[in-house]
Design a protein with these regions (language model features):
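ABC-type nucleotide-binding domain
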Residues: 1-172
Length: 172
């Protein structure tokens, strides 16, 4: 599913309503005929792997950024990095998945570009492995070549999941 609209038209707000980050104040959102307010926030959160346009990468290890609270599975971890087109960069890091990002907590931490951060946010969403993947302007910080690589892999890495793609460009 693609949601395309002008900047400021409410695309991100729509997604945040679906994820129950905001409560619906007018009308209703139904999941299988049941009002979204009948579901716990935790059950809704478990449905979605989301990359918002205002994502955050934390000053912790690469592994902790991707896996969050999940158990670490090396094969799955590197497959997600591969699908997000950042595995090669991760494998060149001195401490691989244990390398800290940024220097806030570790003076040997590595600085990453905006495009690399966006790819890591995508890898994090893929690692969560939720049934619905939502990508809100997922390639905004990427150059055209990297953007094309992500789009060419998009169907393969969402596989049998529901995918919702948000963009202000119809060409995306």
């Amino acid at each position: 599913l693609a949601v395309v609209g002008r900047n400021g038209s409410g695309k991100t707000t729509f997604i945040k309503l679906m994820c129950r980050l905001y409560d619906v104040t007018d009308g209703e959102i139904l999941i299988n005929g049941t009002d979204i307010k009948e579901y716990t926030r935790e059950s809704i959160t478990g449905l979605y792997s989301v990359v918002f346009q205002d994502f955050k990468i934390f000053s912790v290890s690469l592994k902790d950024n991707i896996c969050a609270n999940s158990d670490f599975d090396s094969d799955r971890f590197y497959a997600c990095l591969e699908n997000a087109n950042i595995k090669d960069r991760a494998e060149r890091l001195a401490d691989k998945e244990n390398t800290y990002l940024y220097k806030d907590l570790d003076e040997t931490g590595v600085e990453i570009s905006g495009g690399e951060a966006q790819k890591l946010a995508l890898a994090r969403a893929l690692y969560k492995d939720a049934p619905v993947v939502i990508l809100d302007e997922p390639t905004a910080a990427l150059d055209p070549i990297a953007e094309n690589e992500i789009y060419s892999r998009f169907n393969s890495f969402v596989q049998n999941k529901t995918a919702i793609y948000i963009s202000h460009r119809l060409s995306s």
